[in-house]
Amino acid sequence: MFAIGQEIDKDSLVNLVMNARDIIGDNSALTAGSLNLGDDTVGKVGILDLGAKQSIVNVLNKLNFQTVAISPKESAENILSMNLKGILISNGPGDPRSLEGVINTVQKLIGNIPIFGICLGHQILSLACGLTVKKLEFGHHGSNHPVEIKGIKKALITAQNHGFAVDAVSYTHLTLPTSSW
């Protein structure tokens, strides 16, 4: 660490941040392997837990999915052996570019199982597909962000808390595999 008043060059500071403790493991909200029983008429969805919110589990359960919490340290091989319908990569804190282990795992999952991501999970999935994620100059933080949904003639006010985004320039000529559940 460093103290106020101590001089530190930019490269040293970036290195310090990139090698900081694993905040994802500290923020996993679900118990790995826990099973929230839904109707199971649809199947099981794995939640790769980078700091998931309980509301995500609740929505999936209301859609009659069982949900299985997966540790961010789990191997792709073990995840694929769980016989899941798909994987949700959850939201969570931090710079997605520093999560190389999770990105490598997701790269091995792509093409083998349907995957979708929320916030940090979307950024991880984008990095695994070769896209670029950039730090926003001014992050989106707070509960007053209007979002227009196509087909609805009004804006919804949303709560947001993110400081990174997928760089639109990085996917202008990329074809991604798609599948449905």
Feature-to-residue mapping (PLM):
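RNA-binding accessory domains that recognize and position tRNA/RNA substrates
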Residues: 1-73, 77, 81-82, 96
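Short, glycine/acidic-enriched loop or turn micro-motifs at the edges of active sites
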Residues: 52, 93, 178
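Active-site environment of divalent metal-dependent phosphoester hydrolases
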Residues: 54, 165-167
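Short loop/helix-cap segments at secondary-structure boundaries that form the rim of catalytic
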Residues: 79, 126, 168-171
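Cysteine-nucleophile active-site neighborhood
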Residues: 86, 91-157, 163-165
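Conserved small/polar residues in nucleotide/adenosyl-binding loops
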Residues: 172-178
